[in-house]
């Protein structure tokens, strides 16, 4: 029996239902889900995480869809992908990475891997599906 390994990645600063949705969709793309949690110093496209690196890994690892969680490499985001050798890389619907750019980088490294994008989760009326929005709400309500 062939096992399909899937990689998901992200910051996962303050966990919310959007993260769970992404990880469930990623898990459905294969048999084993490996999650690479971005190191704080590598998060440059948005505000740095509030929650420490190891704590974010521990929280992600505790989620049902996740089989393995690890901290990303300090200098090269593709090192863990080379170690895992996944069949699929699952991108979140709102992640800033472009599928074509990831595919090109994988080809350059000799990695044969499908790149797919998970779909969005529609928020219910009272749901907050963004870490930034959660932080803003906390600041508004606790000030």
Swiss-Prot record:
Q: Which Pfam families match?
A: CTP_transf_like
Query: What keywords is this UniProt entry annotated with?
Result: ATP-binding, FAD, Flavoprotein, FMN, Nucleotide-binding, Nucleotidyltransferase, Transferase
- Per the record's keyword annotation, is Flavoprotein included, yes or no? yes
GO molecular function per UniProt = ATP binding; FMN adenylyltransferase activity
Q: In which pathway does it act?
A: Cofactor biosynthesis; FAD biosynthesis; FAD from FMN: step 1/1
Q: Where is ATP annotated to bind?
A: 11-12, 16-19, 94
| Catalysis: reaction(s) | FMN + ATP + H(+) = FAD + diphosphate
The source's domain of life comes to Archaea
HAMAP family per record: FAD_synth_arch
Assembly information from the UniProt record: Homodimer.
Q: What does this protein do?
A: Catalyzes the transfer of the AMP portion of ATP to flavin mononucleotide (FMN) to produce flavin adenine dinucleotide (FAD) coenzyme.
**Protein name according to UniProt:** FAD synthase
Q: Per the UniProt entry, what species is this protein from, by scientific name? A: Halomicrobium mukohataei (strain ATCC 700874 / DSM 12286 / JCM 9738 / NCIMB 13541) (Haloarcula mukohataei)
